[in-house]
């Protein structure tokens, strides 16, 4: 398994490049707008980007998912959770809770983790040749090191009245999903 964390300090935005070296395929999770970084990582490691995942609809930065898909031919795997008003309005592969996608030998399992946003999903990664147990969890803005995402932003920053309490309750319930993880 190949893994590289890509961090944009100016935006405080993290993305991830994961790949199956045996199959020569890779995925990018939450790509930043400047996609050249991922193209270069793929080139340096003899991999083709075939999958693009997003943890949620990003309001705080411009994502590079659509451009990266156009340049590489990769499929976009995006949340199909959240209900009306939280749908992506362009072609993608919709992902629901417990859906699984293989990137070579790497298994990506979807966990619906609403709270920060209603459609938020996390990705549980298992390196199947090495282990039956997951080795990484990509949570987007749902969980941070030592903190959790803010369920109040939709109400405070976007003016979506009545979402703060619902978001906090959803986040509380979502956190309990993690108690079942190894």
Sequence positions of predicted segments:
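Metallo-beta-lactamase
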Residues: 24, 107, 117-182
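Metal-associated gating/positioning segment near the N- to mid-region
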Residues: 61, 66-67, 73-76, 80, ...
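Active-site environment of divalent metal-dependent phosphoester hydrolases
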Residues: 36, 57-62, 83-86, 118-119, ...
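Active-site metal-binding motif and surrounding structural segment of the metallo-beta-lactamase
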Residues: 33-77
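Active-site neighborhood of phospho(di)ester-bond hydrolases with catalytic His/Asp-centered motifs
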Residues: 28-29, 49-58, 77-80, 112-115, ...
């Amino acid at each position: 398994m190949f893994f590289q964390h890509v961090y944009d300090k100016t935006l405080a935005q993290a993305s991830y490049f994961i790949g199956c070296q045996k199959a020569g395929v890779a995925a990018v999770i939450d790509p930043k707008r400047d996609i050249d970084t991922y193209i270069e990582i793929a080139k340096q490691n003899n991999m083709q980007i075939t999958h693009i995942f997003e943890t949620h609809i990003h309001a705080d930065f411009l994502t590079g998912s659509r451009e990266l898909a156009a340049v590489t031919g990769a499929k976009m795997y995006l949340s199909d959770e959240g209900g009306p008003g939280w749908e992506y309005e362009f072609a993608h592969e919709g992902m629901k809770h417990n859906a699984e996608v293989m990137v070579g030998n790497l298994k990506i399992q979807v966990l619906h983790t609403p709270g920060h946003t209603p459609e938020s999903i996390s990705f549980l990664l298992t390196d199947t040749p090495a282990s039956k147990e997951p080795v990484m969890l990509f949570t987007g803005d749902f969980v941070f090191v030592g903190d959790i995402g803010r369920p109040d932003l939709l109400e405070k920053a976007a003016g979506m009245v009545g979402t703060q309490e619902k978001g906090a309750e959803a986040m509380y319930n979502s956190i309990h999903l993690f108690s079942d993880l190894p």
